[in-house]
């Protein structure tokens, strides 16, 4: 609440009244079932304010009685009988329930206890791997069983299930991979599509795959497949219509009033406005009331965390101490857990988070939310072929979700760092990823599933024809496609690419590596790029980080530097003290080793020769150039960079080891757009290698540029 903002009188609402998931906003004729839960309608007694333990937090007590009492205290428990009666008789259902109501942990258990799993496994999909793992851990605790037995999980490169598993949490991408070999999903009796409102690219494809499997099983007289779509908020009419007019079940949850404040004037610097808001709240509110701030990404969060800590050291006497905690997906797991723990006496928790705190987790103690109204999201331009991460406005639905974090346990306050007029111009719903992302991976998966015509696939929200054609063109350039009888099919190379749980370009990189005798090195590099950041870069210790990293830096770029770090990590046996001294995330680096082992196994199953370059760095760089040729840039006469094929202006990201260098030509892994378009994860290459890799492609691009 910046002083210059001049907040108007507060507007009150009850959590859920803003988004279109409330019963009052359902269209006439839609079947809506209101399910009474603890804390709604005056029911719930003394337990009405108990909270579901956060996803990543272990159960509060090792004693079965305490765990069972916790289950019974959840808002959803009051509706258990009604829910089972409804779900038992429905093929499809859309279920809406507030974050923290217990729906994700309890619905699978209710279905299992009601006998739904006798004819097949109950699958629960999640957009994020951390949620799938922690939810499976929590539910296995509640069922008093070893993880991997009755309850298990499957995420990319990690399968903790057995023949006994009846409740299986998995990422949406992993269920898609299973559909490649079994399009009917025969092993499942029920698929629960959780956090459906996030509309990730994998989730949207999964909607169509599950719907088709359900229909086909019915046509073949197979055991029916039950499909339940769950979320804290969503466009229920769209989901209900898509799943054959599925009834909407609404869990009436605990609702506490929240005051919403807007700024009087637009804020040019949302980071400064957020900082001012935090310290005004901190100096006026009791220390027991915690603050949640929404920013866009790791760099912003770490920078603001440092600034908050520095300012907090110089506050006047009598002001509470401040415990500043960052929260983002690539943060080491142990540090993520800290947000769920209570602050020491006399301290206020200030949690600075990405949108991971919108719906995926429940954090207790939050009284104030500071919403910058910004989020980092992918955008794809099929004309230029560029996919970038860009900071943009949230949707109205996201804004209401953020606001609702303040009303989990008691009345709350949300400070929106934008005007009410600006809010009214926000998109109603978040644009699905499938309409704003590169679709090459999607098309490869659909073709691997032998979908007859990818252009007519039953998407809930259809991507533009330009996006689909651009994806097909990319796969064609990678040698993955061929045309047979007016139909697209996969080439032998394409089928091999689909066998890897990777982006097509990285799968192609591995498959190209035997030609350059560097498969061992490429497996390591691709594994490093497939895992959340293995490097920890606290802004407060920037000079120290640069000092210890000097010994690893390669003049050939970031890929080779990461390769050097991984080799040292392996040579020292994954020493955790070494990781700490060198600002390396030991957990993520261990995961890299596991990912690498699985990718290597896939290569061996294909009878691929696996050789090492034995220190020949050029062969590794040539391999990267031959497979990532669509992600390259060249130095221009004025000292700037432009992409090789579309001549889009780009710059080297400050985090790159090449930031102070001017190599003539580079290959990059990712583009990030902030104040300009930055390339991340770079490798120095020779421009001539690109023309060797795709001569016709670059000749065509050169002609277009001249014209």
UniProtKB/Swiss-Prot annotation:
Record region (HA2): 471-562
Keywords: ATP-binding, Cytoplasm, Helicase, Hydrolase, Inflammasome, Nucleotide-binding, Nucleus, Ubl conjugation
A Pfam family that the UniProt record links to this protein: OB_NTP_bind
Bias (Gly residues) ranges: 39-49
Positions of ATP binding: 97-104
Motif DEAH box: positions: 194-197
Superkingdom of the organism of origin: Eukaryota
Subcellular compartments: Nucleus, Nucleolus; Nucleus, Nucleoplasm; Cytoplasm; Nucleus
GO biological process: positive regulation of MAPK cascade; positive regulation of NF-kappaB transcription factor activity; positive regulation of NLRP3 inflammasome complex assembly; positive regulation of transcription by RNA polymerase I; positive regulation of type I interferon production; translational initiation
SUPFAM superfamilies, A to Z: P-loop containing nucleoside triphosphate hydrolases
Record keyword Membrane present: no
Record PTM: Ubiquitinated, leading to its degradation by the proteasome. Deubiquitinated by USP36.
Biased composition (Low complexity): 50-64
Motif Critical for rDNA-binding per record, residues: 547-558
Main localization of the protein described in the UniProt heading: nucleus
E.C. number(s) listed in UniProt: 3.6.4.13
Keyword Metal-binding tagged: no
Gene Ontology cellular-component annotations: cytoplasm; NLRP3 inflammasome complex; nucleolus; nucleoplasm; nucleus
Stretch list, region Required for nucleolar location: 1-80
Assigned protein family: Belongs to the DEAD box helicase family. DEAH subfamily.
Role this protein plays: Implicated in nucleolar organization, ribosome biogenesis, protein synthesis and cytoplasmic dsRNA sensing. Stimulates RNA polymerase I transcription of the 47S precursor rRNA. Associates with ribosomal DNA (rDNA) loci where it is involved in POLR1A recruitment. In the cytoplasm, promotes elongation-competent 80S ribosome assembly at the late stage of mRNA translation initiation. Senses cytosolic dsRNA mediating NLRP3 inflammasome formation in macrophages and type I interferon production in myeloid dendritic cells. Required for NLRP3 activation induced by viral dsRNA and bacterial RNA.
Subunit structure: Interacts with UBTF. Interacts with DDX3X, EIF3G and EIF3H; the interaction is independent of RNA. Interacts (via HA2 region and Helicase C-terminal domain) with the components of the large ribosomal subunit RPL3, RPL7, RPL26 and RPL27. Interacts (via DEAH box) with NLRP3 (via NACHT domain). Binds to mRNA. Binds to double-stranded RNA (via the helicase C-terminal domain). Interacts (via the helicase C-terminal domain) with MAVS.
Name this protein carries in UniProt: ATP-dependent RNA helicase DHX33
Organism of derivation: Homo sapiens
Encoding gene (name): DHX33
